[in-house]
């Protein structure tokens, strides 16, 4: 059997699978989990694939991209996604994580897929809310948006960010869809003075790019090497990965230079 991943509207990848382990459907999402000899378990959430053996790559990158550029990380907001492993990484900073996800049926169906599902859900520093309005009013050190936000959402989330806070969002991969990345950078640039694209170096199974945005905190100039060295139990993230994530080939530098703010 095969499953197909849409990388772009014109590019697809196929993966051999052995069996379907789970099929759960809600009003807004479809989650299927498959067994694969090559990649362990593979989750297909709508059109996106998650590889259980490689979950740590994105969660480590996004958590520590924010955590290692901020002196203090006390309050974090995660929206528009299901990745509880991201919260697990953020707990290394003794931070409080607000996690907004309305689809509890799908979230709970990841119980055997996310290695730290129970540890995160039962952590005293974790708050799960169905809607953002259910949370206490506060300002955040870091906001992670796990889907590409439109300008309206960027504006709303920015209002909850501390003056030196960091906003990280998912975007299209700049090599695969540079026009989409241009537009995402342009939208973010209307609200922040630092706006820089990055990717996950050496991650071969992803079609995602990301954007790091802030009013004051720079992802390279404000990098705190001592915090990186102090991290324990990480398998992907280090200082070299952090810096390499922002490296762009010459042609992309030319294409995106009008929209990058560094």
Curated annotation (Swiss-Prot):
MF annotations from Gene Ontology: spermidine synthase activity
Record pathway: Amine and polyamine biosynthesis; spermidine biosynthesis; spermidine from putrescine: step 1/1
Keywords: Cytoplasm, Polyamine biosynthesis, Spermidine biosynthesis, Transferase
Record flagged with keyword Transferase: yes
Ranges for domain PABS: 1-249
Reactions the enzyme catalyzes: S-adenosyl 3-(methylsulfanyl)propylamine + putrescine = S-methyl-5'-thioadenosine + spermidine + H(+)
Protein's UniProt keywords contain Transferase: yes
Enzyme Commission identifier(s): 2.5.1.16
SUPFAM superfamilies: S-adenosyl-L-methionine-dependent methyltransferases
Cell compartments where the protein resides: Cytoplasm
Protein residues bound to S-methyl-5'-thioadenosine: 29
Entries under Pfam families matching the protein: Spermine_synt_N, Spermine_synth
Active site: 155 (proton acceptor)
Function as written in the Swiss-Prot or TrEMBL entry: Catalyzes the irreversible transfer of a propylamine group from the amino donor S-adenosylmethioninamine (decarboxy-AdoMet) to putrescine (1,4-diaminobutane) to yield spermidine.
Subunit structure: Homodimer or homotetramer.
Protein's recorded name: Polyamine aminopropyltransferase
Organism of this sequence: Helicobacter acinonychis (strain Sheeba)
Gene that this polypeptide is encoded by: speE
């Amino acid at each position: 059997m095969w499953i197909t991943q849409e990388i772009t509207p014109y590019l697809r990848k196929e993966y051999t699978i052995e069996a379907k382990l789970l099929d759960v459907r809600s009003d807004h999402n479809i989650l299927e989990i498959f067994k694969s000899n090559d990649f362990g378990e593979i989750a297909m959430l709508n059109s996106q694939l998650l590889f259980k053996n490689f979950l740590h790559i994105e969660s480590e990158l996004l958590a520590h991209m924010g955590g290692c550029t901020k002196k203090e990380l006390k309050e974090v907001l995660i929206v528009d996604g299901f990745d509880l492993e991201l919260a697990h990484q953020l707990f290394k900073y003794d931070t409080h994580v607000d996690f907004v996800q309305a689809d509890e049926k799908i979230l709970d169906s990841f119980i055997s897929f996310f290695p730290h599902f129970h540890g995160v859900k039962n952590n005293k520093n974790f708050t799960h809310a169905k809607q953002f309005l259910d949370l206490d009013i506060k300002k955040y050190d870091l906001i992670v948006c796990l889907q590409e936000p439109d300008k309206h959402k960027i504006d709303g989330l920015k209002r909850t960010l501390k003056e030196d806070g960091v906003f990280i969002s998912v975007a299209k991969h700049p090599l695969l869809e540079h026009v989409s990345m241009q537009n995402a950078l342009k939208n973010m640039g209307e609200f922040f003075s630092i706006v820089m694209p990055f990717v996950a170096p050496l991650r071969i199974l992803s079609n995602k790019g990301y954007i790091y945005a802030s009013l004051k905190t720079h992802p390279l100039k404000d990098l705190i090497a001592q915090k990186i060295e102090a991290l324990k139990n990480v398998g992907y993230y280090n200082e070299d990965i952090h810096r390499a994530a922002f490296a762009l080939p010459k042609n992309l530098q030319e294409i995106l230079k009008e929209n990058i703010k560094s």
